[in-house]
């Protein structure tokens, strides 16, 4: 007779939710985690009294009221709204690209004005884009590329945009509204006190073993 009903590899959000739901149905779960902590990439650390997302940042967002109610039953969420600001040599721009960005960049106030400006600048590249730089310009024009795409992308990839393939950027989000909210989902926030409160609650009914890796072999495949 097996000691456990389920062996769950990984204690991140997926594994923790599965363990929680299975435990509620009377199933015995063993969760193994190769790291020295639970929570996967949403794990948080307390540093000088500040909750830090070790692998983050992670902003929870969903368009499902059912999912939102589920996580709020586990832990209270704050009302944080993700509205990033990009700093280009002391010039501050709202992200993702929206009418506040375009107003700061060009002084335009209507969507039609912004669309015309982008359309004019997109013509700087003709034909099929051969690299990421050309692809980005074809999508959003030269000004947005030079100030808000080029530096970030080159830092991310460690290479010049001209040396990166065009397919890396399929699309760039552009909004012609005065909305600085990064996400379109109606529900978003960060759990008060960090994500550890959620994963601790989810894993409460399961046995958890840390620093245990798992490799599928012929011997354990039929577990």
Question: Which sequence ranges carry the predicted segments?
Answer:
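Dinucleotide-binding Rossmann-like beta1-alpha1 core, especially the glycine-rich loop
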Residues: 48-123
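N-terminal Rossmann-like FAD-binding beta1-loop-alpha1 element of flavoenzymes
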Residues: 4-31
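Short glycine-/acidic-enriched loop or helix-start segments at secondary-structure transitions
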Residues: 18-19, 41-42, 219-220
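Glycine-rich FAD pyrophosphate-binding loop
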Residues: 23-48
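Active-site/ligand-binding neighborhood in enzyme catalytic cores
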Residues: 89-93, 100-220
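Core beta-strand elements of the Rossmann-like FAD/NAD(P) dinucleotide-binding domain
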Residues: 2-4, 217-223
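Short amphipathic alpha-helical segments and helix-helix/interface helices
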Residues: 19, 68, 199-203
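Conserved beta-strand segments of alpha/beta enzyme cores
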Residues: 28, 51, 76, 207-209
């Amino acid at each position: 007779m097996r000691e456990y009903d389920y062996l769950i590899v990984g204690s991140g959000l997926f594994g923790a939710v599965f363990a929680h739901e299975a435990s509620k149905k009377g199933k015995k779960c063993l969760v193994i985690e190769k790291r020295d902590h639970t929570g996967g990439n949403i794990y948080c650390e307390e540093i000088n009294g500040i909750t830090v997302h070790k692998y983050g940042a992670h902003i929870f967002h969903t368009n499902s009221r059912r999912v939102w109610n589920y996580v709020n039953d586990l832990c209270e969420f704050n009302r944080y709204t993700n509205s990033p600001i990009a700093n280009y040599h002391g010039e501050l721009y709202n992200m993702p690209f929206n009418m506040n960005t375009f107003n700061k960049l060009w002084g335009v106030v209507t969507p039609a004005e912004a669309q015309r400006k982008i359309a004019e600048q997109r013509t700087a590249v003709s034909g099929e884009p051969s690299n990421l730089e050309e692809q980005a310009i074809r999508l959003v024009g030269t000004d947005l590329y030079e100030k808000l795409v080029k530096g970030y992308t080159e830092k991310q990839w460690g290479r010049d945009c001209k040396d990166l393939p065009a397919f890396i950027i399929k699309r760039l989000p552009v909004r012609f509204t005065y909305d600085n909210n990064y996400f379109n989902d109606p529900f978003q926030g960060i759990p008060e006190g960090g994500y550890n409160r959620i994963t601790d609650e989810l894993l409460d009914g399961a046995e958890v073993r840390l620093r245990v890796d798992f490799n599928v072999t012929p011997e354990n495949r039929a577990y």
